[in-house]
Amino acid sequence: MLEATLNHRIGDFTLAVDLRLQSSGVCAIFGPSGCGKTTLLKALAGLLRTQGHVKFNGQCWQDQNTHVPAYERAAGFVFQDNRLFPHLDVASNLDFARQRAAKGRIEYQEVIDTLGVQSLLSRGITGLSGGEAKRVAIARALVSQPKILLMDEPLSGLDHASKQDILGYLRRLNQHFALPTLYVSHDIEEVARLCDHMVMMRSGQVVDMGPTAEIIQKLNQTSDQTAHPGGAVIHAKVSAHRADFSLTELDLAGHKLFAPIRSDLSIGETMQLFLPARDVALATQKPEGLSIRNTVPGIVDTLHADANDRIRVAIKVADQMLFAQITRQASEALALKPGLPVFALVKSVALD
């Protein structure tokens, strides 16, 4: 377990947090820019001196009389800007971390294979793409034999394809190494796709924490739908890969969904997805003759209006919840109300 009570003042900004987190899975530290996410992560890593205490798995990292330096905390840190040594090649960057690490359970070759960096080992840092450099930075953190991984906005600055690529690697790392991870982000979609739990921050304080799906469901009820465009974390099982159409077939509570092909996932594996509310349309009768391939029946659970006459509709599908964001005019035309059967229409590309 990670326990931390920290206070720190920087100019007009004050960090004041009290955390109790289980040492498993991927936990997001989420909130708007400037809320203190990176400051908190650096304090936990020992890169920033603060008042308070930090304890990890029973070991005191910081209290009134103790401050274990960053290099002794067994915490692997992945910086937003990677911090790789440009004068060394990839292999030497990894060796720099490996040679200074205590012996641990993480095997060097496993890291190389899992992150797909074998072909990069002889390359110089300056010649790497953004996604390649990020994989090397993650590999360097792992070969240092950490007991916990701390990641500061690791997808920042990457294009969409590279982000999806790195998210896939991060999911595999979580499954393969079972290393507890704290993941700083202000992007709700990447958090929903990757993280099991969330810590919500605002103005230097923790305002909520819990399972990702529950926290995002709370955000769907906010009156500020511009700040939180909303959506749902859904879990669907991989049932087939349709290579002829470059699609993966998913099972959501007995209903078929088609997503862009994810051949890295095994048949029977459960996939965690984020479905943005803006990408869900609604119908009161099953439509025909549409290009949209995903039609999921459900029941209207709640309707929540914002100040701009937009309605966020919660649709219950078995034990999961989808959300659609529509206009008030559309809601009234469909006569939507709790308990009404509807069909949720989802484009396959929305499940990328």
Stretches found by the model and what they are:
Residues G124-L128, E132:
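Conserved ABC ATPase signature
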Residues Q59-D63, K103-L120, T126, R171-R172:
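Conserved ABC ATPase "signature" region
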Residues W61-G76, R100:
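ABC ATPase NBD coupling module
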